[in-house]
């Protein structure tokens, strides 16, 4: 459900003295010393600030490392808070309530290499823009759908590790990762408008997690499994759709396959786009087809983006 989150704590004079006495007066050395202890446990201080005499520590938590497991749910909140409590008390001498300024939701799905390559190719044909969100796809194994306050992306986790020359953990092998990051401005908006506290417990709920993925990723990649035109046409022809609409639906799929989803929205009216998408949802066919001439491509790929799995 979650991967990482960033927090900060403000230190009073006594707490800063404790921090320096225990780890070092030189802040950079102190950070290195702390990270040497806590980095393997999933907690890393990335920087400190001093504004108007207030000293603040900013740190990132990798919840998979913190708890030693990948399936993290609201049932783990006590263990998460226990580890955060111990860390803060250790570096400041007492507990200070941390303020969350970013959280990264994740959905990891095991997909073989060939299908990961094909899926990343297909994701390039998704909409270029939806609302305030824009697609950025300059990288072969990563696609972003960003606005100022929320960043969504799809990437090949194993290939990302290789690119960074980092070790690949067992839970990262063959993984296609879907990720939605809520930035501080969005958390502040939720706090202001809905009185949602900026802490991990508030955001560690399955329904909220699903809502963010649907709103910020599913609108681009859509539901339904992936087919070649031959397989899709066969499924359409065997359906209960009106005969007059069957060939029109096939032509709609061909248009997206050839030109991408963005150009298809310019050719078809909103009425027909909604109509054809409704048909495709009923048939569980993704609007983006597997190219029939793609080398060694299968004729069917199950959609890995399944929030009910």
Residue positions per predicted region:
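Structured, helix-rich domain cores that form ligand/interaction pockets
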Residues: 1-259, 283-309
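Short, aromatic/basic-rich helix-turn unit that serves as a nucleic-acid recognition element
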Residues: 257-269
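Helix-turn-helix DNA-binding segment
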Residues: 273
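Residues in the recognition helix of alpha-helical DNA-binding motifs
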Residues: 276-279, 283
């Amino acid at each position: 459900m979650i991967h990482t989150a960033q927090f900060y704590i403000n230190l009073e004079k006594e707490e800063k003295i404790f921090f320096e006495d225990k780890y070092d007066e030189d802040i950079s050395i102190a950070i290195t010393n702390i990270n040497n202890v806590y980095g393997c446990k999933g907690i890393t201080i990335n920087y400190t600030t001093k504004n108007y005499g207030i000293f603040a520590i900013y740190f990132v938590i990798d919840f998979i490392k913190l708890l030693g497991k990948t399936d993290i749910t609201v049932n783990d909140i006590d263990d998460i808070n226990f580890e955060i409590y111990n860390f803060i008390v250790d570096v400041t001498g007492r507990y200070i309530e941390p303020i969350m300024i970013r959280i990264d939701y994740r959905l990891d799905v095991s997909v073989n290499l060939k299908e990961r390559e094909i899926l990343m190719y297909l994701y390039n044909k998704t909409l270029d823009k939806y609302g305030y969100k824009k697609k950025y796809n300059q990288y072969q194994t990563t696609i972003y759908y960003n606005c100022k306050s929320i960043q969504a992306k799809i990437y090949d986790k194993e290939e990302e590790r290789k690119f960074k020359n980092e070790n690949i953990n067992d839970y990262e092998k063959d993984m296609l990762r879907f990720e939605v990051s809520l930035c501080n401005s969005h958390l502040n908006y939720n706090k202001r408008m809905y009185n949602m506290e900026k802490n991990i417990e508030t955001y560690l709920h399955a329904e909220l997690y699903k809502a963010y993925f649907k709103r910020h990723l599913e609108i681009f990649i859509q539901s339904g499994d992936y087919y070649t035109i031959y397989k899709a046409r066969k499924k359409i022809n065997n359906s209960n759709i009106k005969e007059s609409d069957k060939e029109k639906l096939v032509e709609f799929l061909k248009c997206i396959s050839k030109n991408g989803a963005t150009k298809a929205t310019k050719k078809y009216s909103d009425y027909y786009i909604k109509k054809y998408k409704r048909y495709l949802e009923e048939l569980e066919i993704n609007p983006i087809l597997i190219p029939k001439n793609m080398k060694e491509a299968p004729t069917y790929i199950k959609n890995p983006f399944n929030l009910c799995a």
